[in-house]
């Protein structure tokens, strides 16, 4: 008998999608279906955890912001 899994459609830039695919590649816990370069369907109950991991990964990759003080 077929099983249904509730999912959420995520639309993002290809660069962000590649990070999401990279996060999922370890255990395949998040992605239900990889649709195209900008869209992916993610398990509904895993969206908040995926957001947290994505934010952590982005913080690692982005340079720290410089303070814009003119002293």
Swiss-Prot record:
Subcellular locations according to the entry: Nucleus
Function: Component of the general transcription and DNA repair factor IIH (TFIIH) core complex, which is involved in general and transcription-coupled nucleotide excision repair (NER) of damaged DNA and, when complexed to TFIIK, in RNA transcription by RNA polymerase II. In NER, TFIIH acts by opening DNA around the lesion to allow the excision of the damaged oligonucleotide and its replacement by a new DNA fragment. In transcription, TFIIH has an essential role in transcription initiation.
Subunit structure: Component of the 7-subunit TFIIH core complex composed of XPB/SSL2, XPD/RAD3, SSL1, TFB1, TFB2, TFB4 and TFB5, which is active in NER. The core complex associates with the 3-subunit CTD-kinase module TFIIK composed of CCL1, KIN28 and TFB3 to form the 10-subunit holoenzyme (holo-TFIIH) active in transcription.
Keyword DNA damage assigned: yes
Protein's UniProt keywords contain Metal-binding: no
Gene3D superfamilies noted in UniProt: TFB5-like
GO BP term, pick one: nucleotide-excision repair, preincision complex assembly
Native source organism of the sequence: Gibberella zeae (strain ATCC MYA-4620 / CBS 123657 / FGSC 9075 / NRRL 31084 / PH-1)
Superkingdom, taxonomy of origin: Eukaryota
Protein name: General transcription and DNA repair factor IIH subunit TFB5
Record keywords: DNA damage, DNA repair, Nucleus, Transcription, Transcription regulation
